[in-house]
C-alpha cells in the first residue's frame, strides 16, 4: 500500500506507551488519523502532520513507484533542485524515534539522489533539528538548509553579541541555502547546541516582548505546536519592524556562507 497502516506496522496494531514516547512527534499522542476505506471500515494510518499530509510508505512497491514517478516528473518539467520536505520522518522503525533513522535514511536518500541525477537534477533534504544532522548531510555532499542562522542572528542583534554567530560561520556547511524566515516561521530547535539553553530562552522572550505582530498563543499546543519548535512570524516582525535592523540582517545573510534564500512574504 501507499500508506502506513498501524495494524501492519505495530506488533499489536497500536504502539505501546514506551514506543509512543520514543517517537519524535509533533502531537502529544501517537501520530495517526483514523482513515475510512471504501468498504466503510476504519483504520489508523500514520500521520505526522495534518490530515491532508498522510505519511507515505517508503518500504512498499507502491511507495517506491510513487516516489520515483514524482521525482522524474518534477525533473522532466524543469526542476533542477528538488526539495524533500520533512525528509527525516520518511523512515520508520518500531522502537526508534522514527526520525532520521540511520542507516536506513541514507539508503532512501541515495535512492532519491540516484533517480534525480538520472534526470539531471539534485535533491535538497529539508530537516529541522540539531545542526549535526546538516553537517552529516554536508559530509556526504548533499545540499542542506541553514535553519540555525535566523535565531543566531536575532540573538546577535538583540544582545549585541556575535560570539555564537561567528562560531557557526566557522563550522557551518558551505553547500547550503541560508534563510532568515520561511513559511514555517523561525526555527528554535535548530540552534540547540549552538546557543546555550538560557540564551535561547532569552532570545525567545525578547522576541515575544519586542517583536511586532508576534503572539505566544500561535506557538502553543492549541495551534499544534507541542513545543516551541518554530516561532510563527516574519523576520521583519521579529526585529520589531525596524528597517535598519532588517537591512543589517539581510546584508549579513547575503555575505554568510551559502546561497541566500529570501522568503517573499518576509520582504
Model-derived regions, located:
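Active-site and adjacent substrate-binding regions of carbohydrate-active enzymes
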Residues: 1-267
Amino acid at each position: 500500500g501507499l500508506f502506513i497502516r498501524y495494524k501492519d506496522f505495530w506488533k499489536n496494531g497500536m504502539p505501546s506507551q514506551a514506543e509512543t514516547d520514543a517517537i519524535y512527534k509533533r502531537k502529544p499522542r501517537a501520530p495517526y488519523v483514523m482513515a475510512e476505506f471504501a468498504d466503510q471500515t476504519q483504520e489508523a494510518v500514520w500521520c505526522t502532520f495534518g490530515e491532508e499530509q498522510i505519511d507515505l510508505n517508503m518500504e512498499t512497491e507502491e511507495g517506491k513507484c510513487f516516489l520515483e514517478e514524482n521525482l522524474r516528473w518534477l525533473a522532466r518539467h524543469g526542476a533542477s533542485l528538488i526539495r524533500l520536505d520533512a525528509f527525516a520522518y520518511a523512515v520508520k522503525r518500531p522502537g526508534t524515534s522514527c526520525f532520521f533513522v540511520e542507516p536506513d535514511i541514507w539508503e532512501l536518500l541515495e535512492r532519491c539522489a540516484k533517480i534525480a541525477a538520472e534526470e539531471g537534477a539534485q535533491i535538497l533534504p529539508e530537516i529541522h533539528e540539531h545542526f549535526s544532522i546538516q553537517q552529516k548531510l554536508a559530509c556526504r555532499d548533499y545540499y542542506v538548509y541553514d535553519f540555525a542562522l535566523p535565531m543566531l542572528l536575532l540573538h546577535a542583534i538583540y544582545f549585541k553579541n556575535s560570539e555564537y554567530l561567528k562560531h557557526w560561520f566557522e563550522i557551518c556547511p558551505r553547500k547550503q541555502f541560508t534563510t532568515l524566515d520561511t513559511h514555517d516561521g523561525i526555527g528554535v530547535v535548530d540552534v540547540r547546541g549552538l546557543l546555550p539553553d538560557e540564551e535561547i530562552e532569552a532570545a525567545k522572550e525578547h522576541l515575544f516582548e519586542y517583536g511586532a505582530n508576534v503572539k505566544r498563543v500561535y506557538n502553543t499546543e492549541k495551534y499544534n505546536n507541542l513545543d516551541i519548535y518554530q516561532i510563527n512570524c516574519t523576520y521583519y516582525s521579529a526585529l520589531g519592524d525596524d528597517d535598519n535592523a532588517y537591512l543589517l540582517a539581510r546584508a549579513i545573510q547575503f555575505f554568510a556562507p551559502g546561497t541566500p534564500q529570501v522568503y517573499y512574504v518576509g520582504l
